[in-house]
């Protein structure tokens, strides 16, 4: 059996999939902490995706109830639902902090068992941040607070 992975049809399917992912992403790459190291940005550039032909599926002002005092920050508008954070937390760290919430187009990655992140047993190991391909999970930036001190 021969499987062709670089035919025009396969390349077009890849491009369409990336465009669909980008339609649910906030696409503010210039101001993102992952700019230059974002895997979605790299794949988009490699495939030549310069604009998204689909209407953005982000709800205006979509926010999550996330504390700004916790060292881990989550941006649901940058999350592409790859579930790497869930896998690394479950299989490597054995903490099960993250879980899938909702279904269909409302699917999101959230703290398991409908807990707040402060109530979860997160060890702050940073593995979920390291494995996040976009800026969906990142460490809290206290640069301005340090300069103000």
Predicted regions and their residues:
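Fe-S ferredoxin-like electron-transfer domains
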Residues: 1-124, 130, 136-149
């Amino acid at each position: 059996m021969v499987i062709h992975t670089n035919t025009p049809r396969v390349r077009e399917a890849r491009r369409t999939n990336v465009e669909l992912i980008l339609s649910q992403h906030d696409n503010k790459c210039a101001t993102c902490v992952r700019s230059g190291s974002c895997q979605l940005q790299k794949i988009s550039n490699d495939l030549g995706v310069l604009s998204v032909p689909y209407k953005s599926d982000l709800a205006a002002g979509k926010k999550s109830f996330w504390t700004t005092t916790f060292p881990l920050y989550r941006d649901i508008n940058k999350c592409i639902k790859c579930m790497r954070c869930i896998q690394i937390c479950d299989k490597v760290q054995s903490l099960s902090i993250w879980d899938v919430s909702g279904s269909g187009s409302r699917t999101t990655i959230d703290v398991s068992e409908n807990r707040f992140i402060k109530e979860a047993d997160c060890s702050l190991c940073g593995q979920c941040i390291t494995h996040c391909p976009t800026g969906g999970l990142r460490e809290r930036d206290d640069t301005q607070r340090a300069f103000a001190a």
